[in-house]
Amino acid sequence: MKLDAPFNLDPNVKVRTRFAPSPTGYLHVGGARTALYSWLYAKHNNGEFVLRIEDTDLERSTPEATAAIIEGMEWLNLPWEHGPYYQTKRFDRYNQVIDEMIEQGLAYRCYCTKEHLEELRHTQEQNKEKPRYDRHCLHDHNHSPDEPHVVRFKNPTEGSVVFDDAVRGRIEISNSELDDLIIRRTDGSPTYNFCVVVDDWDMGITHVVRGEDHINNTPRQINILKAIGAPIPTYAHVSMINGDDGQKLSKRHGAVSVMQYRDDGYLPEALINYLVRLGWGHGDQEIFSREEMINYFELDHVSKSASAFNTEKLQWLNQHYIRELPPEYVAKHLEWHYKDQGIDTSNGPALTDIVSMLAERCKTLKEMARSSRYFFEEFETFDEAAAKKHFKGNAAEALTKVKEKLTALSSWDLHSTHEAIEQTAAELEVGMGKVGMPLRVAVTGSGQSPSMDVTLVGIGRDRVLARIQRAIDFIHAQNA
Protein backbone atom coordinates (compact mmCIF):
# COMPACT_ATOMS: atom_id res chain seq x y z
CA MET A 1 0.00 0.00 0.00
CA LYS A 2 1.12 3.51 -0.77
CA LEU A 3 1.28 6.54 1.45
CA ASP A 4 -1.01 9.41 0.38
CA ALA A 5 0.17 12.49 2.29
CA PRO A 6 -2.18 15.52 2.26
CA PHE A 7 0.85 17.83 2.57
CA ASN A 8 4.55 17.72 1.79
CA LEU A 9 6.24 15.46 4.34
CA ASP A 10 9.56 17.19 4.92
CA PRO A 11 12.11 14.39 5.52
CA ASN A 12 14.13 16.75 7.73
CA VAL A 13 11.28 16.94 10.25
CA LYS A 14 12.01 14.25 12.84
CA VAL A 15 9.03 14.94 15.11
CA ARG A 16 5.49 15.59 13.96
CA THR A 17 2.64 15.59 16.47
CA ARG A 18 -1.07 16.17 16.12
CA PHE A 19 -4.12 17.29 18.03
CA ALA A 20 -7.20 15.48 16.79
CA PRO A 21 -10.39 16.54 18.60
CA SER A 22 -13.89 15.35 17.76
CA PRO A 23 -16.19 18.35 17.09
CA THR A 24 -19.04 17.17 19.27
CA GLY A 25 -18.68 19.98 21.81
CA TYR A 26 -16.43 22.78 23.02
CA LEU A 27 -12.66 22.57 23.55
CA HIS A 28 -12.44 21.48 27.19
CA VAL A 29 -9.44 21.95 29.46
CA GLY A 30 -8.44 18.29 29.20
CA GLY A 31 -8.27 18.54 25.43
CA ALA A 32 -6.47 21.87 25.67
CA ARG A 33 -3.80 20.35 27.91
CA THR A 34 -3.35 17.46 25.47
CA ALA A 35 -3.02 19.95 22.60
CA LEU A 36 -0.51 21.98 24.63
CA TYR A 37 1.66 18.96 25.47
CA SER A 38 1.57 17.81 21.86
CA TRP A 39 2.42 21.32 20.62
CA LEU A 40 5.23 21.79 23.14
CA TYR A 41 6.83 18.45 22.27
CA ALA A 42 6.84 19.35 18.58
CA LYS A 43 8.33 22.80 19.25
CA HIS A 44 10.91 21.36 21.69
CA ASN A 45 12.15 19.11 18.90
CA ASN A 46 11.94 21.68 16.08
CA GLY A 47 9.09 19.63 14.67
CA GLU A 48 5.65 20.24 13.21
CA PHE A 49 2.18 20.28 14.72
CA VAL A 50 -0.92 19.11 12.82
CA LEU A 51 -4.55 19.99 13.60
CA ARG A 52 -7.00 17.28 12.54
CA ILE A 53 -10.76 17.37 13.06
CA GLU A 54 -12.05 13.84 13.64
CA ASP A 55 -15.63 14.37 12.51
CA THR A 56 -16.61 10.83 11.48
CA ASP A 57 -19.47 10.84 14.02
CA LEU A 58 -21.83 12.51 11.57
CA GLU A 59 -24.77 12.63 13.98
CA ARG A 60 -22.93 14.42 16.81
CA SER A 61 -20.35 16.52 14.94
CA THR A 62 -21.36 20.13 14.30
CA PRO A 63 -19.79 23.09 12.45
CA GLU A 64 -20.34 25.16 15.61
CA ALA A 65 -18.21 22.77 17.67
CA THR A 66 -15.49 22.81 15.01
CA ALA A 67 -15.47 26.61 15.05
CA ALA A 68 -15.33 26.61 18.87
CA ILE A 69 -12.33 24.25 18.88
CA ILE A 70 -10.43 26.38 16.36
CA GLU A 71 -11.34 29.55 18.28
CA GLY A 72 -10.01 27.97 21.48
CA MET A 73 -6.75 26.92 19.84
CA GLU A 74 -6.24 30.39 18.40
CA TRP A 75 -7.02 32.08 21.73
CA LEU A 76 -4.47 29.84 23.46
CA ASN A 77 -1.99 30.72 20.69
CA LEU A 78 -1.22 27.13 19.69
CA PRO A 79 -0.64 27.55 15.93
CA TRP A 80 -0.40 24.55 13.63
CA GLU A 81 1.84 24.04 10.59
CA HIS A 82 -0.66 21.78 8.80
CA GLY A 83 -4.45 21.66 8.84
CA PRO A 84 -7.09 21.72 9.91
CA TYR A 85 -7.79 18.45 8.09
CA TYR A 86 -11.27 16.94 8.21
CA GLN A 87 -11.79 13.19 8.21
CA THR A 88 -15.14 13.53 6.42
CA LYS A 89 -13.24 14.91 3.41
CA ARG A 90 -10.95 11.85 3.31
CA PHE A 91 -13.51 9.04 3.09
CA ASP A 92 -12.36 8.09 -0.42
CA ARG A 93 -8.83 7.60 0.90
CA TYR A 94 -9.96 5.42 3.81
CA ASN A 95 -12.14 3.27 1.57
CA GLN A 96 -9.30 2.89 -0.91
CA VAL A 97 -7.11 1.40 1.84
CA ILE A 98 -9.96 -0.82 3.10
CA ASP A 99 -10.55 -2.21 -0.40
CA GLU A 100 -6.85 -2.99 -0.74
CA MET A 101 -6.89 -4.71 2.65
CA ILE A 102 -9.80 -6.91 1.53
CA GLU A 103 -7.90 -7.84 -1.65
CA GLN A 104 -4.82 -8.75 0.39
CA GLY A 105 -6.75 -10.80 2.95
CA LEU A 106 -6.10 -8.32 5.76
CA ALA A 107 -9.80 -7.55 6.15
CA TYR A 108 -13.05 -9.28 5.23
CA ARG A 109 -16.71 -8.57 4.65
CA CYS A 110 -19.08 -9.59 7.45
CA TYR A 111 -22.74 -10.21 6.57
CA CYS A 112 -23.88 -11.27 10.03
CA THR A 113 -27.21 -9.85 11.09
CA LYS A 114 -27.73 -7.90 14.28
CA GLU A 115 -29.82 -10.80 15.59
CA HIS A 116 -27.03 -13.30 14.98
CA LEU A 117 -24.48 -11.11 16.77
CA GLU A 118 -26.80 -10.61 19.76
CA GLU A 119 -27.40 -14.37 19.97
CA LEU A 120 -23.63 -14.99 19.80
CA ARG A 121 -22.99 -12.48 22.58
CA HIS A 122 -25.73 -14.01 24.74
CA THR A 123 -24.28 -17.51 24.34
CA GLN A 124 -20.76 -16.35 25.15
CA GLU A 125 -21.94 -14.50 28.26
CA GLN A 126 -23.83 -17.59 29.44
CA ASN A 127 -20.64 -19.62 28.99
CA LYS A 128 -18.74 -16.89 30.87
CA GLU A 129 -16.64 -16.19 27.80
CA LYS A 130 -15.47 -12.74 26.72
CA PRO A 131 -17.88 -11.50 24.02
CA ARG A 132 -16.12 -11.43 20.65
CA TYR A 133 -16.89 -12.06 17.01
CA ASP A 134 -16.51 -15.72 16.01
CA ARG A 135 -15.24 -15.06 12.44
CA HIS A 136 -18.32 -16.69 10.99
CA CYS A 137 -17.89 -14.71 7.76
CA LEU A 138 -14.11 -14.99 7.41
CA HIS A 139 -14.34 -17.89 4.97
CA ASP A 140 -17.93 -17.38 3.84
CA HIS A 141 -17.90 -16.66 0.11
CA ASN A 142 -21.58 -17.31 -0.54
CA HIS A 143 -22.58 -13.64 -0.38
CA SER A 144 -22.45 -10.89 -2.97
CA PRO A 145 -20.44 -7.74 -2.14
CA ASP A 146 -23.65 -5.85 -2.95
CA GLU A 147 -25.45 -7.33 0.05
CA PRO A 148 -25.45 -5.25 3.27
CA HIS A 149 -22.26 -5.87 5.20
CA VAL A 150 -19.58 -4.37 7.38
CA VAL A 151 -15.84 -4.81 6.90
CA ARG A 152 -13.77 -6.26 9.74
CA PHE A 153 -10.03 -6.11 10.28
CA LYS A 154 -8.49 -9.57 10.55
CA ASN A 155 -6.73 -9.14 13.87
CA PRO A 156 -3.84 -11.50 14.72
CA THR A 157 -4.91 -14.31 17.05
CA GLU A 158 -1.46 -15.22 18.36
CA GLY A 159 1.09 -13.23 20.37
CA SER A 160 0.60 -9.82 21.89
CA VAL A 161 0.95 -6.12 21.18
CA VAL A 162 3.80 -4.45 23.06
CA PHE A 163 4.56 -0.74 23.01
CA ASP A 164 6.64 1.62 25.12
CA ASP A 165 4.39 4.45 26.22
CA ALA A 166 6.41 7.67 26.62
CA VAL A 167 4.52 8.44 29.83
CA ARG A 168 3.55 5.04 31.24
CA GLY A 169 6.35 2.74 30.13
CA ARG A 170 5.94 -0.75 28.67
CA ILE A 171 2.36 -1.85 27.94
CA GLU A 172 1.48 -5.33 26.65
CA ILE A 173 -1.93 -6.60 25.51
CA SER A 174 -2.55 -10.14 24.31
CA ASN A 175 -4.08 -10.42 20.84
CA SER A 176 -6.50 -12.94 22.30
CA GLU A 177 -8.09 -9.98 24.12
CA LEU A 178 -8.78 -8.15 20.86
CA ASP A 179 -11.70 -8.61 18.49
CA ASP A 180 -11.91 -8.35 14.71
CA LEU A 181 -12.60 -4.63 14.69
CA ILE A 182 -15.24 -3.22 12.32
CA ILE A 183 -13.41 -0.76 10.07
CA ARG A 184 -16.29 0.07 7.69
CA ARG A 185 -19.95 0.32 8.62
CA THR A 186 -22.93 -0.96 6.65
CA ASP A 187 -23.52 2.53 5.24
CA GLY A 188 -20.00 2.54 3.78
CA SER A 189 -18.51 4.98 6.27
CA PRO A 190 -15.13 4.09 7.84
CA THR A 191 -14.89 3.87 11.62
CA TYR A 192 -12.92 6.07 14.01
CA ASN A 193 -10.12 3.64 14.87
CA PHE A 194 -9.37 2.99 11.22
CA CYS A 195 -9.45 6.64 10.10
CA VAL A 196 -7.00 7.53 12.86
CA VAL A 197 -4.53 4.91 11.65
CA VAL A 198 -4.60 6.03 8.02
CA ASP A 199 -4.35 9.70 9.00
CA ASP A 200 -1.39 9.15 11.31
CA TRP A 201 0.34 7.25 8.49
CA ASP A 202 -0.46 9.73 5.72
CA MET A 203 0.43 12.73 7.86
CA GLY A 204 3.73 11.30 9.05
CA ILE A 205 2.80 11.50 12.73
CA THR A 206 5.76 10.38 14.84
CA HIS A 207 4.34 10.96 18.33
CA VAL A 208 0.72 10.60 19.44
CA VAL A 209 -0.05 12.47 22.67
CA ARG A 210 -3.57 11.79 23.92
CA GLY A 211 -5.66 10.98 26.98
CA GLU A 212 -5.38 7.73 28.87
CA ASP A 213 -8.93 6.86 27.81
CA HIS A 214 -7.41 5.96 24.41
CA ILE A 215 -5.06 3.27 25.76
CA ASN A 216 -7.47 0.49 24.79
CA ASN A 217 -7.54 1.78 21.20
CA THR A 218 -3.76 1.70 20.85
CA PRO A 219 -3.16 -2.07 20.39
CA ARG A 220 -5.93 -2.24 17.79
CA GLN A 221 -4.43 0.69 15.91
CA ILE A 222 -0.91 -0.74 16.12
CA ASN A 223 -2.09 -4.03 14.60
CA ILE A 224 -3.70 -2.19 11.68
CA LEU A 225 -0.54 -0.11 11.18
CA LYS A 226 1.55 -3.28 11.08
CA ALA A 227 -0.87 -4.90 8.61
CA ILE A 228 -0.67 -2.05 6.11
CA GLY A 229 3.09 -1.70 6.52
CA ALA A 230 3.00 1.74 8.14
CA PRO A 231 5.51 2.97 10.75
CA ILE A 232 4.27 2.91 14.34
CA PRO A 233 4.42 6.24 16.16
CA THR A 234 5.46 6.68 19.77
CA TYR A 235 2.40 6.87 22.02
CA ALA A 236 2.08 9.00 25.14
CA HIS A 237 -1.12 8.65 27.16
CA VAL A 238 -1.61 11.44 29.69
CA SER A 239 -3.74 11.09 32.81
CA MET A 240 -7.16 12.56 33.36
CA ILE A 241 -7.86 15.87 35.09
CA ASN A 242 -10.00 15.63 38.22
CA GLY A 243 -11.86 18.24 40.20
CA ASP A 244 -10.59 19.17 43.66
CA ASP A 245 -12.86 16.44 45.08
CA GLY A 246 -10.98 13.72 43.19
CA GLN A 247 -13.83 13.10 40.74
CA LYS A 248 -13.43 13.51 36.98
CA LEU A 249 -13.55 17.20 36.05
CA SER A 250 -17.03 18.22 34.93
CA LYS A 251 -19.34 21.22 34.80
CA ARG A 252 -20.22 20.82 38.47
CA HIS A 253 -16.63 21.83 39.31
CA GLY A 254 -17.06 25.10 37.40
CA ALA A 255 -15.93 26.04 33.93
CA VAL A 256 -14.54 23.26 31.75
CA SER A 257 -14.61 24.99 28.36
CA VAL A 258 -11.49 26.91 27.37
CA MET A 259 -13.54 29.82 26.05
CA GLN A 260 -15.51 29.93 29.29
CA TYR A 261 -12.24 30.80 31.00
CA ARG A 262 -11.82 33.61 28.48
CA ASP A 263 -15.35 34.75 29.28
CA ASP A 264 -14.60 34.57 33.01
CA GLY A 265 -11.66 36.94 32.64
CA TYR A 266 -8.58 34.75 32.40
CA LEU A 267 -5.63 35.54 30.18
CA PRO A 268 -4.49 32.77 27.81
CA GLU A 269 -0.99 32.96 29.33
CA ALA A 270 -2.41 32.13 32.76
CA LEU A 271 -4.44 29.16 31.53
CA ILE A 272 -1.52 27.83 29.46
CA ASN A 273 0.86 28.17 32.43
CA TYR A 274 -1.66 26.46 34.69
CA LEU A 275 -2.35 23.60 32.27
CA VAL A 276 1.33 22.87 31.61
CA ARG A 277 1.89 22.40 35.35
CA LEU A 278 -1.18 20.18 35.64
CA GLY A 279 0.76 16.95 35.22
CA TRP A 280 4.23 18.17 34.24
CA GLY A 281 6.95 19.97 36.14
CA HIS A 282 10.48 21.32 36.02
CA GLY A 283 11.81 21.36 39.55
CA ASP A 284 9.83 23.66 41.83
CA GLN A 285 9.28 26.32 39.16
CA GLU A 286 5.66 27.50 38.94
CA ILE A 287 5.75 30.34 36.42
CA PHE A 288 6.97 29.61 32.89
CA SER A 289 7.33 31.79 29.84
CA ARG A 290 6.34 30.20 26.54
CA GLU A 291 10.04 29.89 25.65
CA GLU A 292 10.81 28.12 28.94
CA MET A 293 7.99 25.65 28.39
CA ILE A 294 9.37 24.79 24.95
CA ASN A 295 12.94 24.48 26.23
CA TYR A 296 12.13 22.30 29.23
CA PHE A 297 9.22 20.13 28.07
CA GLU A 298 9.82 16.38 27.87
CA LEU A 299 7.20 13.63 27.75
CA ASP A 300 9.05 11.50 30.29
CA HIS A 301 8.49 14.22 32.88
CA VAL A 302 4.70 13.98 32.51
CA SER A 303 3.05 12.42 35.56
CA LYS A 304 1.21 9.09 35.36
CA SER A 305 -1.15 10.19 38.13
CA ALA A 306 -4.36 12.15 37.69
CA SER A 307 -4.13 15.88 38.41
CA ALA A 308 -6.56 17.94 40.47
CA PHE A 309 -7.82 21.23 39.06
CA ASN A 310 -7.42 24.10 41.53
CA THR A 311 -9.20 27.32 40.60
CA GLU A 312 -7.47 29.35 43.33
CA LYS A 313 -4.07 28.58 41.85
CA LEU A 314 -5.31 29.55 38.39
CA GLN A 315 -6.55 32.86 39.82
CA TRP A 316 -3.17 33.46 41.43
CA LEU A 317 -1.44 32.89 38.09
CA ASN A 318 -3.95 35.10 36.32
CA GLN A 319 -3.31 38.01 38.66
CA HIS A 320 0.43 37.49 38.18
CA TYR A 321 0.07 37.83 34.42
CA ILE A 322 -2.30 40.80 34.71
CA ARG A 323 0.43 42.54 36.74
CA GLU A 324 3.46 41.43 34.76
CA LEU A 325 2.41 41.46 31.11
CA PRO A 326 2.59 44.78 29.22
CA PRO A 327 -0.50 46.91 29.98
CA GLU A 328 -1.04 47.36 26.24
CA TYR A 329 -1.41 43.60 25.81
CA VAL A 330 -3.66 43.14 28.83
CA ALA A 331 -5.79 46.07 27.66
CA LYS A 332 -6.51 44.30 24.35
CA HIS A 333 -7.98 41.36 26.25
CA LEU A 334 -9.75 43.67 28.72
CA GLU A 335 -11.50 45.47 25.86
CA TRP A 336 -13.45 42.30 25.05
CA HIS A 337 -14.91 42.27 28.58
CA TYR A 338 -16.11 45.86 28.40
CA LYS A 339 -17.92 45.03 25.16
CA ASP A 340 -19.32 41.85 26.69
CA GLN A 341 -20.68 43.86 29.64
CA GLY A 342 -22.05 46.57 27.37
CA ILE A 343 -19.71 49.27 28.68
CA ASP A 344 -18.85 52.07 26.24
CA THR A 345 -15.21 53.01 26.86
CA SER A 346 -15.04 55.82 24.31
CA ASN A 347 -15.42 58.49 27.01
CA GLY A 348 -12.96 57.80 29.81
CA PRO A 349 -9.36 56.93 30.59
CA ALA A 350 -7.19 54.78 28.33
CA LEU A 351 -7.60 51.07 29.00
CA THR A 352 -3.87 50.81 29.65
CA ASP A 353 -4.39 53.25 32.53
CA ILE A 354 -7.21 51.08 33.89
CA VAL A 355 -4.88 48.07 33.82
CA SER A 356 -2.17 50.00 35.66
CA MET A 357 -4.66 51.24 38.26
CA LEU A 358 -6.38 47.92 38.97
CA ALA A 359 -3.76 45.22 38.29
CA GLU A 360 -3.06 44.76 42.00
CA ARG A 361 -6.74 44.66 42.91
CA CYS A 362 -8.36 42.32 40.37
CA LYS A 363 -7.91 38.59 39.89
CA THR A 364 -9.73 38.50 36.55
CA LEU A 365 -10.34 40.85 33.65
CA LYS A 366 -14.08 40.34 34.04
CA GLU A 367 -13.79 41.71 37.57
CA MET A 368 -11.60 44.55 36.30
CA ALA A 369 -14.18 45.61 33.71
CA ARG A 370 -17.08 45.33 36.13
CA SER A 371 -15.34 47.22 38.94
CA SER A 372 -14.20 50.07 36.68
CA ARG A 373 -17.54 50.85 35.05
CA TYR A 374 -17.73 54.17 36.95
CA PHE A 375 -14.76 55.49 34.95
CA PHE A 376 -16.89 55.42 31.80
CA GLU A 377 -20.54 55.50 32.82
CA GLU A 378 -22.78 57.10 35.40
CA PHE A 379 -24.09 54.85 38.16
CA GLU A 380 -27.73 54.91 39.22
CA THR A 381 -27.37 54.46 42.96
CA PHE A 382 -24.77 54.51 45.70
CA ASP A 383 -23.82 51.21 47.29
CA GLU A 384 -26.18 51.00 50.25
CA ALA A 385 -23.65 49.73 52.79
CA ALA A 386 -20.96 52.20 51.69
CA ALA A 387 -23.36 55.16 51.78
CA LYS A 388 -24.66 54.18 55.21
CA LYS A 389 -21.11 53.94 56.55
CA HIS A 390 -19.55 57.05 54.99
CA PHE A 391 -22.41 59.48 54.23
CA LYS A 392 -22.90 60.44 57.88
CA GLY A 393 -21.70 63.03 60.37
CA ASN A 394 -19.88 65.85 58.60
CA ALA A 395 -19.73 64.04 55.24
CA ALA A 396 -21.78 66.70 53.43
CA GLU A 397 -19.55 69.46 54.79
CA ALA A 398 -16.39 67.56 53.78
CA LEU A 399 -17.75 66.98 50.28
CA THR A 400 -18.80 70.62 49.89
CA LYS A 401 -15.36 71.79 51.00
CA VAL A 402 -13.39 69.41 48.82
CA LYS A 403 -15.61 70.24 45.83
CA GLU A 404 -14.75 73.93 46.24
CA LYS A 405 -11.04 73.15 46.25
CA LEU A 406 -11.27 70.77 43.29
CA THR A 407 -13.31 73.32 41.32
CA ALA A 408 -10.62 75.94 41.88
CA LEU A 409 -7.76 73.77 40.58
CA SER A 410 -5.98 75.14 37.52
CA SER A 411 -4.44 71.75 36.79
CA TRP A 412 -6.25 68.40 37.09
CA ASP A 413 -3.43 66.00 37.97
CA LEU A 414 -2.40 63.57 40.70
CA HIS A 415 -0.50 66.12 42.77
CA SER A 416 -3.18 68.83 42.66
CA THR A 417 -6.11 66.54 43.46
CA HIS A 418 -4.24 64.88 46.32
CA GLU A 419 -3.35 68.29 47.73
CA ALA A 420 -7.00 69.40 47.57
CA ILE A 421 -8.07 66.40 49.67
CA GLU A 422 -5.20 66.92 52.10
CA GLN A 423 -6.00 70.63 52.57
CA THR A 424 -9.69 69.88 53.14
CA ALA A 425 -8.85 67.38 55.88
CA ALA A 426 -6.45 69.86 57.48
CA GLU A 427 -8.98 72.70 57.48
CA LEU A 428 -11.69 70.48 58.94
CA GLU A 429 -9.17 69.05 61.41
CA VAL A 430 -10.07 65.47 60.53
CA GLY A 431 -8.13 62.50 59.19
CA MET A 432 -7.74 62.00 55.45
CA GLY A 433 -10.22 59.10 55.59
CA LYS A 434 -13.02 61.40 56.77
CA VAL A 435 -12.70 63.25 53.46
CA GLY A 436 -11.40 60.50 51.20
CA MET A 437 -14.02 57.84 51.96
CA PRO A 438 -17.13 60.02 51.45
CA LEU A 439 -15.43 61.32 48.30
CA ARG A 440 -14.76 57.77 47.09
CA VAL A 441 -18.41 56.77 47.53
CA ALA A 442 -19.52 60.02 45.90
CA VAL A 443 -17.49 59.61 42.71
CA THR A 444 -17.47 55.79 42.29
CA GLY A 445 -20.74 54.76 43.93
CA SER A 446 -18.91 52.23 46.12
CA GLY A 447 -16.38 52.01 48.93
CA GLN A 448 -13.63 50.51 46.78
CA SER A 449 -11.35 52.09 44.20
CA PRO A 450 -7.69 52.85 43.56
CA SER A 451 -6.16 55.78 45.46
CA MET A 452 -8.35 58.88 45.30
CA ASP A 453 -5.97 61.03 43.27
CA VAL A 454 -5.67 58.29 40.61
CA THR A 455 -9.44 57.75 40.65
CA LEU A 456 -10.27 61.45 40.32
CA VAL A 457 -7.87 62.00 37.43
CA GLY A 458 -9.20 58.87 35.69
CA ILE A 459 -12.85 59.91 35.99
CA GLY A 460 -12.21 63.49 34.88
CA ARG A 461 -12.98 66.91 36.33
CA ASP A 462 -16.53 67.47 35.05
CA ARG A 463 -17.80 64.05 36.05
CA VAL A 464 -16.15 64.28 39.48
CA LEU A 465 -17.66 67.65 40.32
CA ALA A 466 -21.13 66.62 39.13
CA ARG A 467 -20.99 63.39 41.14
CA ILE A 468 -19.88 65.18 44.31
CA GLN A 469 -22.83 67.56 44.00
CA ARG A 470 -25.15 64.61 43.47
CA ALA A 471 -23.82 63.00 46.66
CA ILE A 472 -24.27 66.22 48.63
CA ASP A 473 -27.88 66.44 47.43
CA PHE A 474 -28.39 62.77 48.31
CA ILE A 475 -27.13 63.30 51.88
CA HIS A 476 -29.32 66.37 52.38
CA ALA A 477 -32.35 64.46 51.08
CA GLN A 478 -31.61 61.59 53.45
CA ASN A 479 -31.38 63.97 56.40
CA ALA A 480 -34.45 66.00 55.53
Curated annotation (Swiss-Prot):
<dbReference type="InterPro" id="IPR049940">
    <property type="entry name" value="GluQ/Sye"/>
</dbReference>
<keyword id="KW-0479">Metal-binding</keyword>
<comment type="function">
    <text>Catalyzes the attachment of glutamate to tRNA(Glu) in a two-step reaction: glutamate is first activated by ATP to form Glu-AMP and then transferred to the acceptor end of tRNA(Glu).</text>
</comment>
<feature type="binding site">
    <location>
        <position position="137"/>
    </location>
    <ligand>
        <name>Zn(2+)</name>
    </ligand>
</feature>
<keyword id="KW-0547">Nucleotide-binding</keyword>
<dbReference type="InterPro" id="IPR033910">
    <property type="entry name" value="GluRS_core"/>
</dbReference>
<dbReference type="GO" id="GO:0004818">
    <property type="term" value="F:glutamate-tRNA ligase activity"/>
</dbReference>
<dbReference type="GO" id="GO:0005524">
    <property type="term" value="F:ATP binding"/>
</dbReference>
<keyword id="KW-0648">Protein biosynthesis</keyword>
<dbReference type="InterPro" id="IPR020058">
    <property type="entry name" value="Glu/Gln-tRNA-synth_Ib_cat-dom"/>
</dbReference>
<dbReference type="Pfam" id="PF00749">
    <property type="entry name" value="tRNA-synt_1c"/>
</dbReference>
<keyword id="KW-0436">Ligase</keyword>
<dbReference type="GO" id="GO:0008270">
    <property type="term" value="F:zinc ion binding"/>
</dbReference>
<feature type="binding site">
    <location>
        <position position="110"/>
    </location>
    <ligand>
        <name>Zn(2+)</name>
    </ligand>
</feature>
<dbReference type="InterPro" id="IPR020751">
    <property type="entry name" value="aa-tRNA-synth_I_codon-bd_sub2"/>
</dbReference>
<feature type="short sequence motif" description="'KMSKS' region">
    <location>
        <begin position="248"/>
        <end position="252"/>
    </location>
</feature>
<keyword id="KW-0862">Zinc</keyword>
<feature type="binding site">
    <location>
        <position position="112"/>
    </location>
    <ligand>
        <name>Zn(2+)</name>
    </ligand>
</feature>
<comment type="subunit">
    <text>Monomer.</text>
</comment>
<feature type="binding site">
    <location>
        <position position="139"/>
    </location>
    <ligand>
        <name>Zn(2+)</name>
    </ligand>
</feature>
<protein>
    <recommendedName>
        <fullName>Glutamate--tRNA ligase</fullName>
        <ecNumber>6.1.1.17</ecNumber>
    </recommendedName>
</protein>
<dbReference type="InterPro" id="IPR000924">
    <property type="entry name" value="Glu/Gln-tRNA-synth"/>
</dbReference>
<feature type="short sequence motif" description="'HIGH' region">
    <location>
        <begin position="21"/>
        <end position="31"/>
    </location>
</feature>
<keyword id="KW-0963">Cytoplasm</keyword>
<keyword id="KW-0067">ATP-binding</keyword>
<dbReference type="InterPro" id="IPR001412">
    <property type="entry name" value="aa-tRNA-synth_I_CS"/>
</dbReference>
<dbReference type="GO" id="GO:0006424">
    <property type="term" value="P:glutamyl-tRNA aminoacylation"/>
</dbReference>
<dbReference type="InterPro" id="IPR014729">
    <property type="entry name" value="Rossmann-like_a/b/a_fold"/>
</dbReference>
<comment type="similarity">
    <text>Belongs to the class-I aminoacyl-tRNA synthetase family. Glutamate--tRNA ligase type 1 subfamily.</text>
</comment>
<dbReference type="GO" id="GO:0005829">
    <property type="term" value="C:cytosol"/>
</dbReference>
<feature type="binding site">
    <location>
        <position position="251"/>
    </location>
    <ligand>
        <name>ATP</name>
    </ligand>
</feature>
<dbReference type="InterPro" id="IPR008925">
    <property type="entry name" value="aa_tRNA-synth_I_cd-bd_sf"/>
</dbReference>
<dbReference type="InterPro" id="IPR045462">
    <property type="entry name" value="aa-tRNA-synth_I_cd-bd"/>
</dbReference>
<dbReference type="Pfam" id="PF19269">
    <property type="entry name" value="Anticodon_2"/>
</dbReference>
<dbReference type="GO" id="GO:0000049">
    <property type="term" value="F:tRNA binding"/>
</dbReference>
<keyword id="KW-0030">Aminoacyl-tRNA synthetase</keyword>
<dbReference type="InterPro" id="IPR004527">
    <property type="entry name" value="Glu-tRNA-ligase_bac/mito"/>
</dbReference>
